[in-house]
């Protein structure tokens, strides 16, 4: 379905790319920020993808198409040959998550350390942040960028 036309067309006859429309809307709603690592997502280009909170492989088609199950995420260094260099959904693949950036209990569990690393008071969320999503990926300089943002305040 990624990038596939919907079967509908604009008034000039060009196909409507529903995937791109949804992705662009998610990016705008999230302020051009990746839902996981919080890096900037450029508004143009193939630098983002739609992430499903509940993986498509483990849910119904209806849930997979539910807008409330979707997030815009960066490419997570998807083309890296080594998994330790990947983050976000590129590192997650289809693993289930306890962390959900749309839920207040997830957000209240988050902690940022002075070295720029992210952790959580909830052990399951901490495992998702550090292991499943690899959000302290030094190869992508995620902690370093977080630390720079914290010291800029």
What is each of the regions a protein language model found here?
Residues 62-78, 102-120:
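Short Fe-S-cluster ligation motifs
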């Amino acid at each position: 379905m990624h990038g596939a036309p919907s079967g509908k067309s604009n008034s000039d006859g060009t196909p409507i790319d529903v995937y791109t429309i949804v992705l662009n809307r998610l990016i705008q709603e999230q302020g051009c920020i990746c839902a996981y690592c919080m890096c900037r997502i450029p508004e143009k280009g193939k630098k983002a993808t739609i992430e499903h909170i509940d993986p498509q492989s483990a849910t119904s088609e209806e849930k997979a198409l539910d807008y409330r199950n979707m997030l815009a995420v960066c490419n997570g260094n998807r083309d890296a040959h080594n998994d330790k260099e990947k983050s976000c959904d590129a590192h997650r693949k289809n693993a289930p998550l306890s962390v959900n950036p749309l839920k207040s209990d997830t957000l209240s569990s988050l902690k940022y350390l002075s070295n720029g690393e992210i952790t959580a008071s909830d052990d399951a969320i901490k495992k998702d942040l550090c292991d499943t999503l690899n959000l302290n990926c030094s190869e992508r300089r995620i902690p370093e960028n977080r630390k720079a943002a914290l010291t800029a305040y």
